[in-house]
């Protein structure tokens, strides 16, 4: 039978029944009886869900489903509580342990009695619910009648279409060209451009496409993008603007009134040309405040506002230069292009509609009202269906019934209802985060796994299965993806889809938000997101069975809060305290037996309590950007750990090894054989070689970052890396710049390696690096290579990013014809002996971004063949000699012709470890600086 929300509960009971060594004495019969009862009820669920989706018998079916769901939660709580009470005695030892076990036997008898009694109560409740369902017409559906094969099951999840840029969702070239002209041309007076239209019309996508354009970036001195949404804090918005336009940090961080935040921002922008985007504005008062902070400085500054509210646009139009642009629904021709691109995306159809489906496709398209979000979403649903008239007619019929209600959100809900249940839970999880929240895919995988949403599959890790889940949500256009080189992936959902998520999450009590110190949670929910003060949270949760707690925007957090959570929420699986003002993690957190994910990112926690060793179910530990310097030895007991995040920096510069730090680990890391991610840890001080040898046991590792590597570790480290068959990301950082790390001993490198960062002196490039077929990002720092490396690296077929920082001491680099055919970004930094960079015609054909300098010996641009880079969009030149920079200026510079084809050219001069003065090509400020250097 197709899965339902009861399927995971039935599986859990089945596992409980068959697990060896688990004591069900006295209750096995009751557990099996309960499982059988759920299997009888499950066929009725499909009928009830179908009625809810089609709005037939809606209220009764929805109420019936809610009652079943509540009983399912009771069962889940019951099982977890029982497991905790039964297993708790397993780890006791010694005389006191024996005494405790004797006491525990008495408690175990009571636990069995309690569970038997609770099961009987649940069964009686389920009987009554089932009978009521039959009474109002629910019938068990036939096995397989509602089976919906998902795309993840049918196709390779690593489809090239999954890595499309967001702006490919809509074909907006004409509109973006018009908007760019409004930004760059026209009056010098400050102008406000309001993009108005209903949700899903493409306002944000249009604004983002133009905002990210290199020509626009080059035209303005300062840039800021602020997502406002319905919930906002004016002070926070002003701080975000200030931070993005690079106002000095001291001013931003001080406690200020609104007026005190406005004044320095206004002064800072008075002499600068700026572009600021306010996305998704709902209230008029935003503009009434912001117009005072953004001066009308006659420098050609521009402000873009996207809104669904006509009043917001009207209020912001204060002079003749201001523009209100109303976005219109798409023409049928434009809509057809997008529809086919999304619905027929695989290799068989290549974006073309089969003739037998053309009329039905047009009929479906006409129902989408010309809204690109609706078109993309419905096409995403169809992309997972068989390409048959029967399937197409079903979708058309559902669309027709929803459109009779003239509610776009109802139409978009079809894409939610089309999801199989395991994906519904994953999709609803975006509801625990704030609107427009961006989350990295690895974090999302860890949360889904911790919640038990990801089902194990043979020959695949849980993370790989979770990646398939996310990829299908992306393919269905339910999740928007922002990716850099296909490695670092940020996910978010459209604001309209977010509203749909909150609606369904609320109906099924999936998650709940507690905002502004609310004192009541209302109906019980499994997950709690706290926004702001926490003083009332413990009163609110009471003896709640909450499974996950997230904090957002919390300014005060007492130790007693975490202690209270540990005492009241015994079934907690996820505790995310990221960015909270937490100085100390209390030992009571060790009592959270079921905890699978603990995030302390960007807190001020200095040490972890030894009691953390009691968290035997912990899978994810995040202490990145904290003050933690060492993980306690008890960590090595946590054999279920899959992810350890522990990275930070002393400063923001990449120019010295001392800028990086990780956390120390005690001996025994080899016991953590389930580790998938380990970043960044330091080798055992004094036992570095032993640490390297222990790494051989981490056969499942996917991402590894090690600091304070020593030269002596080379052979042992190489042997360990060779055994890491699944490794995709590797970073090694040497303990200092004087030692030399020899990695040439590696003969069989991990075939799937796609990210390689080596922060170490090597002198000779290992010959295995050029063999890394899947490598996308290569970062070589402090290598001090004797031989020029480009001849070896040029053939890497999938390399997209290359940075050479203090990598080569020679005088010349030569990019040969046909080399680096896919490279998008190149950074050549601090190559102090470099005098010449040769670039053959046909080399670097796709290069879009180039950053180079300082090269103190390169005095004239004649030595750098920038003119060969025809695809270049962005050029940043760092701390180059005065003569070199003067030669490139448009007013009399003899080598301006070399860079005149590049849309964005900037010159950067470092004035602090992590700060640069940035000047545009030909600007008066740059020329004054160059003149001062010559005096």
Predicted regions and their residues:
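Non-catalytic, charged helical/coil tracts that couple and regulate nucleotide-powered enzyme cores
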Residues: 21, 42-55, 241-255, 299-301, ...
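N-terminal amphipathic alpha-helical segments
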Residues: 1-60, 105, 336-339
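N-terminal flanking helix/linker immediately upstream of nucleotide/cofactor-binding cores
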Residues: 125-201, 205-221, 229-230, 240, ...
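Loop/turn-to-beta-strand initiation segments
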Residues: 272-275, 298-304
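Regulatory and partner-binding modules of innate immune sensors/adaptors
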Residues: 32, 38, 96-198, 205-208, ...
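Surface-exposed helical/coil interface segments that assemble multiprotein signaling complexes
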Residues: 71, 78, 84-93, 101, ...
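Leucine-rich repeat
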Residues: 45, 52, 59, 163, ...
